[in-house]
Amino acid sequence: MQGSVTEFLKPRLVDIEQISSTHAKVILEPLERGFGHTLGNALRRILLSSMPGCAVTEVEIDGVLHEYSSKEGVQEDILEVLLNLKGLAVKVQNKDDVILILNKSGIGPVVAADITHDGNVEIVNPDHVICHLTDENASISMRIRVQRGRGYVPASSRTHTQEERPIGRLLVDACYSPVERIAYNVEAARVEQRTDLDKLVIELETNGALEPEEAIRRAATILAEQLDAFVDLRDVRQPEIKEEKPEFDPILLRPVDDLELTVRSANCLKAETIHYIGDLVQRTEVELLKTPNLGKKSLTEIKDVLASRGLSLGMRLENWPPASIAED
C-alpha cells in the first residue's frame, strides 16, 4: 500500500503568466489523472467564498435619512451611490475596523481619491467614481465604515443591529473577497510515455487589494490546514490546546480622559460610569442621547474624536472588560 502512494507524481509550478497587476494565469503539472479537477475545484471554491479582505459595511451621508432617497446636487440616487461604494478596493493595516471621511464640493466627479484616511489605509482604486456633483454650490459629506471580514455578507444578515442602528446609518452588502473572477481548466499533460496526466490552468482576477499569486497561495494554505486533521487520525483523542485570547487594542484600555473631550461631555460620561474608551465604544448613539445633559453637539464631538482614532460607537467587544480592569 505504501508503495502505491510513493508512485504518485509530484506536480510542479510550470509558469505564472502575469497578464496585468490584477490578472494572472498559473499553470501546474503534471498531475495524476483526475487530480486537476480535484484540486482546481477545491481552490476555486475557497477563492470565491473564503478569502479575507476589507469592504464598506456602513455609510452615513449628511442630509440623507434612508437609501431610497436622493440628494440635491448629486446626479446619482443614494442606492446608486451605495452600489458605487461597494466597488471601493481598500487595504487596511493593523486594524479590523476604520472610519473614512469624504467631503467634496463643486461641480464634477467624486472619486475614491477624495476620501480622507490615515496611514493605515490604502485606496487601491483612487480613480473609482462614487458619484457626480452637478452644481457649483453642491456638496456631499459622508462617513464610510470599512471592516475586515471574509467572503460575502449581505446587509440583510446583519438585522440584529437594526434596533441599535440610528436613523441615517445605511447598511451596505459587504463583499470582503478581493477575488473578482476565478476560472480553471484541465488540459492533457505528458511525462515520457505517460499521456493520461492532467495540467491545471488557473486564471484569476482580483480588485488589486491582493495580488493573484498571493491569493492562490493563501487559498492553498487554507486547504492544507483544513486537511491536516486527516493526516494522522491517531491524534484525534489528544486534548485540544486552547489558544490564548487576543489582547484588546491598548487604546480601548485607556481612560476616556485621554480623549480630551470638553468638560461637559466628560462629566456626562463619568456620570454614566463610562470610565474607559472600551466602555464608550460599546454604547450606541441612542443610548448616549438618553444620558442627562448630553446633547447632539456632545454626541457629534464624541463621534469625531473616536473616528480620528479609527473607532466608532456601537462596536462589539467580546470578553469585555478584561480582568485587569474588572479587578479595579
UniProtKB/Swiss-Prot annotation:
Record flagged with keyword Cell wall biogenesis/degradation: no
UniProt record, GO biological process: DNA-templated transcription
Upper taxonomic lineage: Bacteria, Pseudomonadati, Pseudomonadota, Gammaproteobacteria, Pasteurellales
Function summary: DNA-dependent RNA polymerase catalyzes the transcription of DNA into RNA using the four ribonucleoside triphosphates as substrates.
CDD domains cross-referenced by the UniProt entry: RNAP_alpha_NTD
Segments of this protein annotated with the region Alpha C-terminal domain (alpha-CTD): 248-328
Source organism (scientific name): Haemophilus influenzae (strain PittEE)
Protein's recorded name: DNA-directed RNA polymerase subunit alpha
EC numbers on record: 2.7.7.6
Family annotation (InterPro entries): DNA-dir_RNA_pol_insert (IPR011262), DNA-dir_RNA_pol_RpoA/D/Rpb3 (IPR011263), DNA-dir_RpoA (IPR011773), RBP11-like (IPR036603), RNAP_asu_C (IPR011260), RNApol_insert_sf (IPR036643)
Region (Alpha N-terminal domain (alpha-NTD)) residue spans: 1-234
UniProt entry tagged with the keyword Ribosomal protein: no
Gene: rpoA
